[in-house]
Amino acid sequence: MSDTVPLQIDVDTLRTLRQSGADVALLDVREPWEFDLCAIEGSSSIPLATLPQRAGELPKDRQIVVICHHGGRSAQATAWLRHNGYDKATNLMGGVDAWARRIDPTMKVY
């Protein structure tokens, strides 16, 4: 992968990254109750409201794919992360809803 990380990717690209063994961190910024309902395997939960306080838990040297329900909150989080030095933050377009519908039909949708 080049040093330039796209601002957003779709779920098919995320699946390809994971299948290729890429070192990608998955950050889910939904509320805890949403994360408990369904989550992409391997995701870490840091709700959007707590991101400024907890950003130090995130790696700056790895690509971070930011996830929410449909892509709105994760786009906000991605913009905040990039503004604060996390140049490898990437928004997952469509969020867990798109992941459930295209990649993992066994995942609960809400």
Task: Locate predicted features.
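Rhodanese-like catalytic fold shared by cysteine-dependent sulfurtransferases
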Residues: 1-25, 32-63, 72-110
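Short, surface-exposed ligand- or partner-binding patches at beta-edge/loop junctions that are enriched
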Residues: 67
